[in-house]
Amino acid sequence: MATPRAQKFNPIAFTPGPVTLITTIVYLALLIPILVISLVVPPAPETSPEGVNLTEAWRDLQHLTGGFHPYNSRRNDDVHQWLLRRIDSILRPTVEAGERPSANNDIPDVFVFDDNQSNLTYSNGGVGKAAIVGVYFEGTNIIVYIRGTEDDPENWWERSNGKPKGKGGVLVNAHYDSVSTGYGATDNGMGVVSLLQLLKYFTTPGNKPRKGLVLLFNNGEEDYLNGAHVFSQHPLSNFTHTFLNLEGAGAGGRAALFRTTDTEVTRFYQNAKHPFGSVLAADGFKMGLLRSQTDYVVFNGILGLRGLDLAFIAPRSRYHTDQDDARHTSVDSLWHMLSAAIGTTEGLVSYTGTDFDGKSQGLDKVNSGTGTLGVWFDMFGSAFAVFRLHTLFALSVTLLIVAPLVIFITAIVLSKTDRMYLFSMSKSLGGTDERVSLRGLRGLFRTPIILAVATVIPIGLAYLLEKVNPYIVHSSQFSVWSMMISVWIFLAWFLACAADFFRPSALHRAYSYTWIFIATWVMLVINTVYANQKGIAAGYFVFFYFSGSFLATWVSYLELFALPRKGDFARQAIMHSGRPPSSLRSRLLTPSADELPSDTGPHAEYPGDADETDPTESTSLLRGQRTTFANYRTGGTDGVVEGTDEGPSFKHEQSWSWTLPRWTWVLQLLLLAPIVLILVGQLALFLTTSMSQVGSDGVSTFIVYLACAVFTTLLFAPLFPFIHRFTYHIPTFLFLVFVGTLIYNLVAFPFSPANRLKMFFIQEVNLDDGSNTVSLSGIQPYLTDAINSIPSAAGQNITCDQSAFGKLEKCSWAGLPPRVLGQDHDRDTGIVSSDWMSYNITKTVGENKARIEISGRNTRACKLKFDKPVADFQVSGSAVDHRMPHTSGQGVAEIRLWSRTWDRTWVVDICWHDSHDKPEDDDGDDEKQDAPRNGLSGKVICLWSDSNQSDVIPALDELRLYTPNWVAISKSADGLVEASHGITIQ
């Protein structure tokens, strides 16, 4: 047997070696940076930029997070005073410089408002027909106004009903209160110290703003956005037209832009040094998938401002816990937020256009104009793309029409030139009944079947994890990703190789891209409809996905022009088969003796074959002809000529395919894979990172696993057209990875000290019977494990009920008595009602009206709860605002009372309907039916939220001391301790 002729090595040929190497390099070169961006925060500069002092900012953060400082705590007052001192220390050099004879005109006027006057009664709104919650709040906001060069030079706010002249200013907001169980480093200490540095920056000579800048240090955000609501009563709330809200919904990492009002204001975020975020999060709020709100909804929804929400989003396991402290964050995270705030704010205050000074968006809202819906996302944390949703819609509609048309026209041209091998089973010779098999249908349905299987299996694994170990993603997100990716690639490779072994096809790539083109076309249609009808922009990546798939598919069609015409191939195949066409069978196909060379033996050398190797058993018997179409045989009686597919084509693929370009696959890979990995990869990590730990809040984790499965298919579908060319090494390794990660994900404990499970604490004291109940809410069976570790719960009857929050259960037991009344009143002699609160009820004779006076000891938060909603209420001395109605037709079931002073007495006037005037829902609620027919029953409750001193809430101290190290304790409600007294009004 002769030795085959040596072939030159082609580093980009469509053969196993180059395909495996190049695709692996491309995917790793893009996925690794995306992972790094998701996990690593850009380093802070070694030297602070001019006008900023990072060392000072970090010291401020450490001081601010030295204790819990919720609104209802003494330390909150300390933080308030400390902020005033820090603001004064920042401004003092500026004031001294301005008083000198040679004062620099670059130093702006600065006004500080310690707002201890604003208050407001409003409601949080009801859901459906449910009764609403009324709120009375007294604010302690600190407002700093830096006058801009284009601002009204007069102090217009000092005039009665004074209004500013000129263009609107810019508001930057951060709340300085924390939750009662968290130190508030990222929620929202970093926002607060960023405000202090913004004050320092814009009062530095050379940085004077063109537009006025308002820095709002608001208090009371954690208790239903109270501070932002009461800011609406300050004159400066009518001055600002745009805003930047600094928040923390996680506890470190990068600060993400996760919500904006419009395209125009979003463009200013392009000034951020390290932009990070996607419109996906904004649409999550719009569709109701994300329900946790920030001050953004007040500034935009009520005041009509246009702006941005910038917040930390991960890790959620530290959010609202004692690990939200300076120890568990970094200067790098602080700089990431601060640099973004400086860049965005500088752009907003320097803007000279009129986009934000048009007609108001609604009644009694500021004249901030109307923006357009936008699409925005970062790329590698270094660049930021932003454009109008309408632009995306127009481009999508255009591409939906043009792309199929281009493919269709190309297919027609291929057909006209007789090179359309796709969808071709055979080729007939004109004037004969002979047909040559082209095998052009091979691989037609391979792609949808294999991709369906490769997708269904990860979805099945998502169901399996949800049933067996649903919270493993809480601590092992990347183990889940590894499992999904490895099984997808292995299955796709194995099935594609099996199909290629039994039915090899040179059209595998073309068919694969055609199916991907069809699938993404359908996806783009759906996305375009949602963008047009509902303003949803989260599917922006589909446009780019479809664009890449269109170009890659077009390349597959264009490379068919390199093939021989089907008629030429068929004629040569007929001739090489040794069987003449039926119209020529009367003629001998073999040449005459004169035409034969002298040497006609088996080793004869044909003209033009001097460079060929020695003949073998498979060498063609026809001289002077290419061996491409060798060894064809007559297919029996059906008249179809078939071949053994031997020759220059790859392995046993169709013989006509040998002229296909060997390098175009690289072009196709680069047209589709990078854009998919950059956009879809970042979205996938953004989504799973922000949602991987929502299970502790009672949310089903299946949506996270399902997202991993779907995103895996989206990420690796561009690999499928080449995957049958992979060598076995990587898929085999990935199969082992799959086995290992599957076992780990099914049996590993889902929580750890670094990724703790949050449980929610509240202690309720019934002043009527003296009972004291500690409740802990969490997910089972871990909740029971935590309670079993508590000494005071040992031997008690633990009662557990379904919580109102998703999958959480609430378990209760008799707890250690709290000592929240202050040193002069705490005692161990039992619970005495008068020590905790005092109240008085005066009913108006002959009317369904009453006045309730309530005061709590050592607290500034109480509330009233009613068994049936009251029609209206009024708090003595309170302001009201028709933009925020405090009641509605469905009534008010609860009234929350907040005071800036301690031990304050609230005076609340209420009125209610008779039972026959305002029928209750027919839900059989026994508690409601127990209320007097024309009277009212309910509870007066006071709250305590300060746990900075040990032994004040021993039950909470006990939980922190004895629960496993994988448990984090967070607050369940506004108060850590709630004491209640039943009331009845006849």
UniProtKB/Swiss-Prot annotation:
Residues 595-620 are annotated as: Disordered. GO terms for cellular component: vacuolar membrane. The record marks Y319 as: Transition state stabilizer. SUPFAM superfamilies: Zn-dependent exopeptidases. Binds 2 Zn(2+) ions per subunit. It holds the Pfam family Peptidase_M28. The keyword Transmembrane applies. It is found in: Vacuole membrane. The chain crosses the membrane at residues 21-41, 393-413, 448-468, 478-498, 510-530, 535-555, 666-686, 703-723, 730-750. Keywords: Glycoprotein, Hydrolase, Membrane, Metal-binding, Metalloprotease, Protease, Transmembrane, Transmembrane helix, Vacuole, Zinc. Its EC number is 3.4.-.-. The active site is at E221 (proton acceptor). It comes from the Eukaryota. It is a multi-pass membrane protein. PANTHER family: METALLOPEPTIDASE M28 FAMILY MEMBER, VACUOLAR MEMBRANE PROTEASE. This is Vacuolar membrane protease. It comes from Blastomyces gilchristii (strain SLH14081) (Blastomyces dermatitidis). The lineage of its organism: Eukaryota, Fungi, Dikarya, Ascomycota, Pezizomycotina.
